[in-house]
């Protein structure tokens, strides 16, 4: 069945009368046997309905007769004898008597009464002005703007004639006036088969004889047969031989401009994310001739006409380092780098700081345990070589024999030292243990006797540690006699000095040297600042620093003050009181000067705390100085260190005005370090030397964390 809901026919401007059929609703139709036969005749594919716009914009349909060539091919592979060629001229009188020899399949349809009445009304339509309809050539596809459809089982697209008029015998309005109004909201189940039709545009009668149409092919699936229809237009004398029909064309503008230079095009692709760097050196056109055709072939990369060549020889490709981006940046990167504040704020970086592990003293390694009294023994400063910065006093003739005997006893006892190292945990005492304890007692008594005899030569443990640290100066730096003057020089007689050092300052050498005072520590250091400025004429700049130090002496050296009373206290996180503070300073400075301030009470009550502190701070980056908590003594010590490590600067020399200085300072470098770097290198040479690892001078002034910070800056996405 076919959908009649939107069918309408109108009067055309060149014809007398056209029947106007309007039905805006869908309904169920019942078809009788006679109507089914006529519907079957419409399926013969001898008609075509042309769709056009009539008066008032109402769609109209016009029936056209065409000549078709039908070839029926069985889908199941069986040959049929129903192949035929229908080329007879259409005769309107043949309606109802046409022999459909090419169609064997028939189907019974159920049609209700209303459908019968409608079909009987359609059969009552008759032709008028038949002379106009006798065209020498029937119409086929008139325009390219049409919709092509495939019909399922019943193609109700052909009525009896091209032009229809309304017959006054029956009226559609009189037949169903009330049914559609009542059932308007109830028409939900549509049983009419959906038909897909072939519609073309309608032309006036003046243009129709002069049109010629190209042949086209239509394939229909009708039951088990594949019907292939070739539709050809038949020319006549009145129609021109050739009529050109042009389709709608539009211009396409390509916005991408092709580079005239092949190399420039390749260089531009270096910064493309999806571009492969191997392709940069592999692509080459034959004979280096670059045209638009070659570029188009390059776009179709897999085409056989375009061949890919290596841009370099085989020997050169073997030696080639496949990193064209790196070479391009090294050649074309300008030395001018501007500071971007957004980079320093948004791109935050974190560096894992190395943990500072203090070495612990095991009680069974150093012979300082007195088992009988349950206390620690005194430290042997003369004969013990295990402690760093120790000092050996030359032995006299009377002591040579005793020292030899002691050394023999020690060598004999080392053979049996693994048998029992923890005697106080044993439930019994054997003979081997007694022999070991006797050797230790003899050694201890001998050391006590030597210390009592040489009271003038020995000083307190504190002065010894201080003297040992000062004498443990690297070979590169030598102290002059003007800076340190002791009671007896160490080089002439290797005798331990008495407590305290007599320090003299040469104001001419110290005056004008510049240091930086941390603005966060002004309350603790304001008295020391006044002493240094008034007596030593040292320039002190006050700036708030991100480091937890008191003074910055040069690019790689800082000074920090700590108190001995708080050193061995443990914080909430399980570390020592100053451990995290000292760990942070080792990441920013190659040398950390630690001034440990103590009170006189500690010296008299707990003497062992000094050498314990010294062993805890046994690190190559720490330079430990133990001094009493006296402001004048602290100022003298600081002025001595300033004269050794600091240098002179002008007033305006430490201002950071250039963009290069601001970049380095944004990396948390101190001002002295920034000035020293830019005196030796430009910023470009400095960064280039770090990336290529060609200059070791940078690594001598920077810590590992500072080097890692610069490398993370270079690897950021700009």
UniProtKB/Swiss-Prot annotation:
Cellular compartments annotated: Nucleus; Chromosome
Main location: nucleus
Record's keyword terms, sorted: Cell cycle, Chromosomal rearrangement, Chromosome, Chromosome partition, DNA-binding, Meiosis, Nucleotide-binding, Nucleus
Molecular function as annotated in GO: DNA binding; nucleotide binding
N-terminal signal peptide: none
Any single GO CC term annotated in Swiss-Prot or TrEMBL for this entry: chromosome
Keyword Cell cycle: yes
Any one Gene Ontology BP term: chromosome segregation
Stated family: Belongs to the ZIP2 family.
Purpose of the protein: Required for initiation of meiotic chromosome synapsis. Involved in synaptonemal complex formation, a structure that tethers a pair of homologous chromosomes along their lengths and plays a central role in recombination and homolog segregation during meiosis.
Protein name listed in UniProt: Protein ZIP2
Native organism: Vanderwaltozyma polyspora (strain ATCC 22028 / DSM 70294 / BCRC 21397 / CBS 2163 / NBRC 10782 / NRRL Y-8283 / UCD 57-17)
Encoding gene, per UniProt annotation: ZIP2
